[in-house]
Amino acid sequence: SHSLLKKLKKQSDYYNFNKPTVGSFFRDVNTRGLSATIADRKMWAEMKMNPTDLADVSGYTYTYLMNGQAPLKNWTGLFRPGEKIRLRFINGSAMTYFDIRIPGLKMTVVAADGQYVNPVTVDEFRIAVAETYDVIVEPQGEAYTIFAQSMDRTGYARGTLATREGLSAAVPPLDPRPLLTMEDMGMG
């Protein structure tokens, strides 16, 4: 909306609620030493960024959807045990990257952005804005959670593959929030 953009134009990290703190400074001094910690903080300050600057707007502001459904609505896709299912993941977000997994199921990636690829079996994959991935899964149990957590770990979209309506599987916790390094910024 207009107010989001207005706030970001005034302060680019307005919605970053996970900035480095005095506590993280002392933790870094303990693990990396004083001079390395100061040098690292100085480099980030010169770029007017910080290592938690993964997304301009995050799950603190947005609700991430799967097939138009919020996580609590739990979109459900039905299957028969042993059936091969092709799932197409489309990242329709404006700026969010997602890490997608289906706990308990391997996914075989068969297409990327509409182009067939040599099949690759994965536990998880990252999808950028406007990308699509087609995967094949072969569920055997009753219910599996499709879990798409934002790269900055502030929220997720979720759905369920199930043998019948009303079933759901456990929703995994968000992974720990990653920190950017100078190498991530092309400065290493």
PLM regions: where:
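Histidine-centered copper-binding motifs that mark active-site loops
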Residues: 1-129, 135-136, 165-187
